[in-house]
Regions:
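Conserved C-terminal portion of the radical SAM core fold
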Residues: 1-57, 71-78, 125
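Auxiliary Fe-S-binding modules of radical SAM enzymes
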Residues: 36-40, 50-187
Length: 187
């Protein structure tokens, strides 16, 4: 993995983002190793909260490591993190003083950024989701295969945005989550 990351950093790739699912008692002792990658390299390391989309229910084992704790642990090591302006639809992004790169936290489970979310996903089986935690799916695959007009497909997508819940908690409470894995959801 590090060899590939080094090759990417030596290439002409403009934006390199390294996603790390942070887990208590698994890799929480490596946070600073990941943050350290941003000291001399213009990359973004994004720490992602463990999400409840796994058939083995790992997230119920006490390994959940919330965004607030991730940030607090990083601050304890490097001092203040300077927030960077930008899209706050999926992550909080920061810069450490004198570091070339950036550090971000994606509160995927605590869902503190849902109010600004403008994202949708298309699942591996062609369903459109307006929230990771929603069961409200629109079958784009079948619409395309059945020669539904572009205008009607556009209307379906717009309708999906109009049906977004206020946040992921409301979406989950409304109808539960039936997908067992992020590989099914598209992430």
């Amino acid at each position: 993995v590090l060899n590939s990351l080094n090759k990417a950093m030596q290439s002409s790739i403009q934006s390199i983002k390294l996603n790390v699912v942070a887990m208590r008692d698994f890799n929480d002792d490596e946070l600073m190793d990941f943050v350290g990658l941003t000291k001399e390299n213009d990359i973004t390391v994004r720490f992602i909260e463990l999400m409840p989309f796994d058939s083995h229910q790992i997230w119920k084992t006490g390994k959940f490591y919330g965004a607030d704790h991730i940030l607090a642990d990083i601050k304890n090591q490097v001092g203040e993190l300077k927030p960077i302006d930008g899209s706050r639809t999926e992550h909080h992004i920061f810069r450490v003083d004198d570091y070339k790169g950036k550090v971000a936290v994606i509160p995927a489970y605590s869902r503190s950024l849902c109010g600004a979310c403008n994202r949708i996903r298309i699942t591996a089986d062609g369903k459109l989701l307006n929230c990771l935690y929603s069961q409200d799916e629109m079958n784009l695959r079948d619409a395309i295969r059945n020669d539904v007009s572009d205008e009607n497909i556009q209307s379906m997508i717009q309708g999906s945005f109009l049906k977004k819940y206020k946040d992921g908690w409301a979406a989950q409470q409304s109808n539960g989550t039936h997908r067992e894995s992020m590989t099914q959801i598209g992430g």
